[in-house]
Amino acid sequence: MQTRNAFSWLKKQITRSISVSLMIYILTRTSISSAYPIFAQQGYENPREATGRIVCANCHLANKPVEIEVPQAVLPDTVFEAVVRIPYDMQLKQVLANGKKGGLNVGAVLILPEGFELAPPDRISPEMKEKIGNLSFQSYRPNKTNILVVGPVPGKKYSEITFPILSPDPATKKDVHFLKYPIYVGGNRGRGQIYPDGNKSNNTVYNATAAGIVSKIIRKEKGGYEITITDASEGRQVVDIIPPGPELLVSEGESIKFDQPLTSNPNVGGFGQGDAEIVLQDPLRVQGLLFFLASVILAQIFLVLKKKQFEKVQLAEMNF
């Protein structure tokens, strides 16, 4: 009886441990996956400044390319693809928050014209769903459904991101018109160099906060360094803290200048932005164009037939 009770108690403890571990993993993954877009969402009402600069560039300092591909024109109430490409060398490894090396993640923000929005799931074709994969898109704000964010997601799998977009219908949305509209995109690969509060991440270069002699370098147990700089003229000491990740470039006894790099720059990623144009096409205009082209073709056909008939008449008169 005691053996059975002990076995039952052990089984409950194992089940509880597995459940707790699974909950921690899920919460951690959720926190990590939602952290980066939230930085911009919490700090800025609009991700695109009046100058045209997308605010993600405030934290991702390196400039890298990004590409966007959209149709030249779309009809009202139509689902189409906006493809964002974030190219980078897949062999690169970035510095993670714990100082270790890992793969790069990517993220993107898509700023659509007013009225354009994420297509509902029941309007997305199976072919488009296959291109989208397991990506989860969200609106930048509940009242800004035309601005979409995604990421961070693994770069090796999602360096090309397909957004399913639904075009508006001017017949139901009076503030939308049949015009040419701009679309703006921002895309990053890798972690940022500065947090929204202004503090540096461990994915950037660290500079000396004072000039003098490097009198002491202490390697911390969990990684990183404490560098003591002594100013010989004033006799004061300054301690610079280096987090785990960047590679140290100075040594004890070395004379350094103010703002001199103490570490290498481990950043291999960066942010880029681009734009494209799309025309919301009036179906009646398309029908009118088709009618015009058809009339031109018919006119050409009748002209050819008339010419051949005229030639036959001329030939008959000559034979007569």
Swiss-Prot record:
<keyword id="KW-0793">Thylakoid</keyword>
<keyword id="KW-0732">Signal</keyword>
<dbReference type="GO" id="GO:0005506">
    <property type="term" value="F:iron ion binding"/>
</dbReference>
<feature type="binding site" description="axial binding residue">
    <location>
        <position position="60"/>
    </location>
    <ligand>
        <name>heme</name>
    </ligand>
</feature>
<keyword id="KW-0812">Transmembrane</keyword>
<keyword id="KW-0479">Metal-binding</keyword>
<keyword id="KW-0602">Photosynthesis</keyword>
<feature type="binding site" description="covalent">
    <location>
        <position position="56"/>
    </location>
    <ligand>
        <name>heme</name>
    </ligand>
</feature>
<keyword id="KW-1133">Transmembrane helix</keyword>
<dbReference type="GO" id="GO:0015979">
    <property type="term" value="P:photosynthesis"/>
</dbReference>
<feature type="transmembrane region" description="Helical">
    <location>
        <begin position="286"/>
        <end position="306"/>
    </location>
</feature>
<dbReference type="InterPro" id="IPR002325">
    <property type="entry name" value="Cyt_f"/>
</dbReference>
<keyword id="KW-0150">Chloroplast</keyword>
<keyword id="KW-0408">Iron</keyword>
<dbReference type="InterPro" id="IPR024094">
    <property type="entry name" value="Cyt_f_lg_dom"/>
</dbReference>
<keyword id="KW-0813">Transport</keyword>
<feature type="binding site" description="axial binding residue">
    <location>
        <position position="36"/>
    </location>
    <ligand>
        <name>heme</name>
    </ligand>
</feature>
<feature type="signal peptide">
    <location>
        <begin position="1"/>
        <end position="35"/>
    </location>
</feature>
<dbReference type="InterPro" id="IPR011054">
    <property type="entry name" value="Rudment_hybrid_motif"/>
</dbReference>
<keyword id="KW-0472">Membrane</keyword>
<comment type="similarity">
    <text>Belongs to the cytochrome f family.</text>
</comment>
<keyword id="KW-0349">Heme</keyword>
<dbReference type="GO" id="GO:0009535">
    <property type="term" value="C:chloroplast thylakoid membrane"/>
</dbReference>
<keyword id="KW-0934">Plastid</keyword>
<dbReference type="Pfam" id="PF16639">
    <property type="entry name" value="Apocytochr_F_N"/>
</dbReference>
<dbReference type="Pfam" id="PF01333">
    <property type="entry name" value="Apocytochr_F_C"/>
</dbReference>
<dbReference type="InterPro" id="IPR024058">
    <property type="entry name" value="Cyt-f_TM"/>
</dbReference>
<dbReference type="GO" id="GO:0009055">
    <property type="term" value="F:electron transfer activity"/>
</dbReference>
<keyword id="KW-0249">Electron transport</keyword>
<dbReference type="InterPro" id="IPR036826">
    <property type="entry name" value="Cyt_f_lg_dom_sf"/>
</dbReference>
<dbReference type="GO" id="GO:0020037">
    <property type="term" value="F:heme binding"/>
</dbReference>
<comment type="subunit">
    <text>The 4 large subunits of the cytochrome b6-f complex are cytochrome b6, subunit IV (17 kDa polypeptide, petD), cytochrome f and the Rieske protein, while the 4 small subunits are PetG, PetL, PetM and PetN. The complex functions as a dimer.</text>
</comment>
<feature type="binding site" description="covalent">
    <location>
        <position position="59"/>
    </location>
    <ligand>
        <name>heme</name>
    </ligand>
</feature>
<comment type="function">
    <text>Component of the cytochrome b6-f complex, which mediates electron transfer between photosystem II (PSII) and photosystem I (PSI), cyclic electron flow around PSI, and state transitions.</text>
</comment>
<protein>
    <recommendedName>
        <fullName>Cytochrome f</fullName>
    </recommendedName>
</protein>
